[in-house]
Amino acid sequence: MAMTTRNNNNVLAISKKQLGVLAASAAVGALRNHISESSPALLQSAVGLGKKALNKVRNRRKQGNQQIITHVGGVGGSIMAPVAVSRQLVGSKPKFTGRTSGSVTVTHREYLTQVNNSSGFVVNGGIVGNLLQLNPSNGTLFSWLPAIASNFDQYSFNSVVLHYVPLCGTTEVGRVALYFDKDSQDPEPADRVELANFGVLKETAPWAEAMLRIPTDKVKRYCNDSATVDQKLIDLGQLGIATYGGAGTNAVGDVFISYSVTLYFPQPTNTLLSTRRLDLTGSLADATGPGYLVLTRTPTVLTHTFRVTGTFNLSGGLRCLTSLTLGATGAVVINDILAIDNVGTASAYFLNCTVSSLPATVTFTTTGISSATVNVVRGTRANVVNLL
């Protein structure tokens, strides 16, 4: 029996379709009234759910590499040694960009050095004297960049990242630390106490990767092309690599440096040749160009102590009384050599060698050494020095 209603005293029939529309309209109206009355509570509930989700994201970031499985003796942030760790390395193509006239931005990644393990506390392979000062002209930190930076007066680092890549097994014991010191003339840390006080520091096991991001300030500084009295005025800071707690002195990893630097104000090309001269008393008289090595002598031994890895050509001379005897210690290979002895007056030498890790030295033994001079430049094994 159909429902009826009266309109103007007339009886009208309502179909099932019309009845459904009326019911839906009534339901929508009731829902709208409920939302209007309950809107504050619904809004508060939505805000609460948002806060819970945000807190979960923050907690995950704070946990970092924390293991999902709890390991006995481990705390938050600890990692478990896997069976094997491997990293595939690919070549880095340098990128050049320029937004303003007279400047260029260089982005690249370079190999810095091999890291050897040590039982005691060792910084920068035992080489002291502010080895890794952050300046694009520093030939002991960069091998590729100085050839470009030597054509500019000023620089500004946009980003700098140190990346430690292991090459040892997960059974290797010890620690590897990367740090940054804002003062480029500060002495290297003497022990683990001083190391731990650095604000920009990353430590890891020899078998685990690590990255250290260096803070930059966009300040324009001068490229180091002369003998500067206060290095901290031209350097962004200095980097350091420390090892300790190991069971030997074997190679455990490599360190790469990635950077983006803007160079300003082109200038005549500065020298990439390193010159070191000792006077008659054995004191350093002149030091120009990159600090590839330190030249010292005793009355019987002239010593070249390398401060950076790579292949180099050395040409030098010394006042002495007898013939020269070549010697080498550490990870250095003599590729080619020519020595000219003038017994009783002076001798000269030309040398091509490859240094794969520090420390490494090349020596000449004779008698009656007084003054000496050596010029050093990066080269390749094809730069032979012997006579045909």
Swiss-Prot record:
Keyword Ribosomal protein found: no
A matching Pfam family: Viral_coat
Keywords tagged on the record: Capsid protein, RNA-binding, T=3 icosahedral capsid protein, Virion
GO MF terms held by the record: RNA binding; structural molecule activity
Span list, region Involved in encapsidation: 57-63
PTM per Swiss-Prot/TrEMBL: The N-terminus is blocked.
Membrane spanning residue stretches: none
Keyword DNA damage: no
S domain, virion shell: annotated segments: 103-264
Subcellular location: Virion
PROSITE patterns to which the protein is assigned, alphabetical: ICOSAH_VIR_COAT_S
Sequence segments annotated as region (P domain, projecting): 265-388
GO terms under cellular component: T=3 icosahedral viral capsid
Region annotated R domain, interaction with RNA, chain positions: 2-102
Role: Capsid protein self-assembles to form an icosahedral capsid with a T=3 symmetry, about 32-35 nm in diameter, and consisting of 180 capsid proteins.
Quaternary structure and interacting proteins, as annotated: Homomultimer.
Family: Belongs to the icosahedral plant coat protein family.
Name this polypeptide is given: Capsid protein
